[in-house]
Amino acid sequence: MDKLTEVLNLAKSKGYFWPSYEIYGGVSGFYTIGPMGSLVLKNIEDLWKSYFVRPNGFLEIDSPDIMPARVLKASGHVDNFKDPMAECAKCGSKYRADHLLSDSGIQVSESTSINQMNELLNQNKVKCPNCGATTWTVKQFLNMFETNIGPYADNKGYLRPETAQGIFVEFKTLLDINRGKVPMGIAQIGRGYRNEISPRQSMIRLREFHMMELELFMDPEDEKAPALDRDMKLPLLHEKVMEKGEPELISPYGAYKNGILKSAWLAYFLEKSFKFVMALGVPESKQRFIEKLVGERAHYSAQTFDHEVFFDEMGWTEVAGFAYRTDYDLKSHAKETGQELVVIEKKTISTRKTIKLNEKEVKNTHKKDWESIISSVPESREDGIYCAGIKLSSNEYKIIEEVEKEEVRKFVPYVVEPSFGLDRLLLATIYYAYGKKDGRNILSLPDVILGKVVAVLPLVSKKDMIEKAFEIKAMLEKSGYFVIFDEKGYIGKRYARLDEAGIPKAITVDGQTLEDGTVTIRDRDTWNQKRIRPSDLLV
Amino acid sequence: MDKLTEVLNLAKSKGYFWPSYEIYGGVSGFYTIGPMGSLVLKNIEDLWKSYFVRPNGFLEIDSPDIMPARVLKASGHVDNFKDPMAECAKCGSKYRADHLLSDSGIQVSESTSINQMNELLNQNKVKCPNCGATTWTVKQFLNMFETNIGPYADNKGYLRPETAQGIFVEFKTLLDINRGKVPMGIAQIGRGYRNEISPRQSMIRLREFHMMELELFMDPEDEKAPALDRDMKLPLLHEKVMEKGEPELISPYGAYKNGILKSAWLAYFLEKSFKFVMALGVPESKQRFIEKLVGERAHYSAQTFDHEVFFDEMGWTEVAGFAYRTDYDLKSHAKETGQELVVIEKKTISTRKTIKLNEKEVKNTHKKDWESIISSVPESREDGIYCAGIKLSSNEYKIIEEVEKEEVRKFVPYVVEPSFGLDRLLLATIYYAYGKKDGRNILSLPDVILGKVVAVLPLVSKKDMIEKAFEIKAMLEKSGYFVIFDEKGYIGKRYARLDEAGIPKAITVDGQTLEDGTVTIRDRDTWNQKRIRPSDLLV
């Protein structure tokens, strides 16, 4: 059994996640996150916020899953969010055309056209996996879930393909709440939907998934990005080194300065992402960033990098995408709605002085030259004000100071978007936490992911010990711990069960507990035990 | 302007929530939760868990929004989750038939039939709000959002009308994870969808909403519910007092013992709910529980109580429902799938002794009576074993102990379900927090709802003060605070803005801060200020 299969089995038996609707024979592309998975998911979300949201004073929103068709028409999804679908002429089975081809060893890329795929399938006589026939028709399949809003048949809606559009359509209100200022970061954690033609690969190609997205709105002429790291190195498989196939190790600062990354915010987010995924337990060497070239990128993106994690069984697998969306989305919605979606920047121009002549006085003083004085522009010299080369006395002019003048600049902000697949991160986290010790499975999840989870175990099933254990359980639950209570079986077996489930600490209540109140605490990874007071856990 | 309108205006301008898609002209029944609303929502969720999930060791899961049609056919939703829809014969406008009638002053209840509504609308010549015509056709409208899963046209799906079904279909796996034990509580916080015919009432009738549900599975013959409160009083408008229209004040214990509540868990959850909604800031006197009578209840429920909160503008409004679903759902899914969805309870029968005679020895010892001894049943008396009235010596018999015998009992567990509408709770929380002080608006949200939010304000816009303020901001953000940074405008105006937004504390950085590091901290509700060190906030 390969590691991934072992991990998926463990994920089900220990309550992390499993394919939904199994009693109904299963429906591809849907997973249920179980009790342990829910705890981990919340902690991954919180860790993500500590990297991407909180340090920059960004905001978080929660917008609907259902979107009116007009919004997604304007955003370009109705026209572009499609996959090539091959239909077997004989049995009518439907597949992803590009997957059929690559499974048959025929190279395709994200820029291969529908017609090309049609030809390739038919000319190479690729067999239908269902009936063996070799005649195919390829067309585009819109992979958004369609529905109808309300009772009128013409009111079409879609389930959002990304949370981002729920942010773009609320840009105006959000900018008001942020008091007109950019850079403004708006995060959203929620579900995305993609009506895959024939999903495979368990947690990787889901029809319904969890996303964490951040739309960073900024002034393209003055990005105001945080300082970039000049020392750390990111493995970037960017356009210029793509042919070699090996990532270049380069600092975020260098990659931005050299023009490899088109935005300083993009560089900043790649840096953050690398550290974030490391904190989940994925080693540096199992991460890389790969640039998506023209034709591979989404329709809205001027530059895209995918953050990939390596799995032995699946190779490099995307866990996050970073798109430089520019002003594409705001402009599209502005055009469709006729609304102005802009930042209004008011600049104060520095103090300006103007000299105004007192014409009456000039006429009285300069009987001869007054006309040439009045018709020329006064000039300020070190020793006074001159006009037509003649020095004026102070009663002949007034200096008017315009102290403030506002200059208004309107612009459509540019957007950089980090977008994370939460289910894939969950899988990667468990995959890299999974290991063996003395032939037993251990799920060594990082503390930041499962810190506040603890098991409480009465050593033997005696009434007073169970009561004491319940007392400790209640105390820990009051302090926000998630407590697993397990009173059955040999203690060694219970420890083994907990190690495999990833529970970081186990507290055992024994005879001595009844005497002096102390318990043993056992560590999942080292198997070390020591006696403590239960309240020591709370500090 | 009434209070509700004021609250809704504030909710938008301060970033709590607002109607979605406004730049597209709006789509009824959809709301976006803004930055402040997201913070509050998370805290309401966490508070709910501290009442309903953590204290009992319950589990939480996260299942898909999209469900295959077969699941919701089995659950009874496809046949029952419908509203009466009246269509105008002239202009084709569609409305909730019962709303049209009650708006015209004609009494209907949840048990009035389609045919009755049809007659009532036409006979009373109720006018179409759109064109004024008076001819109607009433039919049932299925209010689930329908979609198609994958590329095959016959693979229908629905957006879940409740999170509960995602729990019921995973019951088998969840019971395994819980090691076969009931009571087992499974919570889910997520979205629900209801394709309303013509939603009105802002946050009350949403087409997409946030729910918090708990399915409590238990043995109906031995509920094992926690101890019920005998002292607190709940206002129950139950069946027996419904006609009087006034709730009876009765303890959860009393209501269960008197048969007003059919399950002890139901009584326990009502008690919890009352305390929970009080913690959100809704006074006792603005809460009640009302029983839903036959015909008003959902198809799956043997007893339902709604938890209602009073709004001046809308009257009593449901924020939660408590349904005694019995074994309805598990039986329905078991029937449809042929799977056994049961709890298997293994009982150990108490130790049993049997006495076996050593016939050879008996024959040797009792030459005369051995036949009558062997043919009778041995009897255990205080002083030894007798057979046919004769005391036997210890070599004449053996006592065989059957130490353990397992008795297996299978049963379909019963379910009690608390189900909360999170959006309505959010509205109620803000509504009851909203008030005035010296003519100014204050949103006095309870600390538990917005505790870790703070504003940091440099007194004047000077470089060193702003830098110091940023330092304090970073420190607070590191400790998990959500920090609002506001450097513009007179300090009094800034305080007023923060009071209205509900921000509990404001920290002001002034000249003295630059000298000794102290700041002033100002309280939203009392307007009191005192000097502290910023690190004092963290303890």
Could you say what each language-model-derived stretch is?
Chain A
Residues 1-539:
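NTP/phosphate- and nucleic-acid-binding module
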